[in-house]
């Protein structure tokens, strides 16, 4: 796994994330300083079930399997986020592992990023919290074997 800062030049990449698309260019430039890029090869583990989580990854390229108790419960790709529940809940244990199935590139947002958003951009924090609640509900449905749209 390779990891590096995207710096303020990554502002447009942040705006491509649907949750952040309403931000101004200046807001994205400020937030980009707190974001890293991760690049992975197939088979590499991005997150491990049971580990403490303090980062979320928004996938830009590639795909990964979400694995819970040894069973693949979802496949994610560009535009999807993984690990955000632990970050939004200000830390917690990972509920699943995430393993790259193709070459993968994504943006890493930390709990520090979310703390800054909550302090400086409360309206955005509300949108993110609402999305997280929907994600939790989808996970609950998926775990109970019910269809998820």
Which stretches of residues belong to each language-model region?
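Cytosolic regulatory regions built on CNB/CRP/Popeye-like sensor folds
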Residues: 1-149
């Amino acid at each position: 796994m390779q990891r590096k800062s995207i710096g303020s030049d990554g502002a447009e990449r942040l705006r491509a994330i649907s949750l952040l698309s309403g931000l101004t260019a200046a807001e994205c430039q400020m937030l980009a300083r707190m974001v890293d890029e991760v690049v992975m090869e197939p088979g590499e583990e991005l997150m491990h079930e049971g580990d403490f989580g303090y980062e979320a990854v928004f996938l830009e390229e590639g795909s990964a399997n979400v694995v819970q108790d040894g069973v693949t419960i979802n496949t994610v790709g560009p535009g999807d986020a993984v690990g955000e529940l632990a970050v939004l809940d200000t830390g917690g244990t990972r509920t699943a592992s995430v393993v790259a199935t193709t070459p993968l590139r994504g943006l890493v947002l930390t709990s520090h990023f979310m703390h800054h958003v909550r302090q400086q951009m409360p309206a955005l924090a509300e949108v993110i919290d609402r999305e997280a609640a929907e994600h939790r509900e989808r996970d609950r449905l998926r775990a109970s074997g019910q269809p998820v749209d």
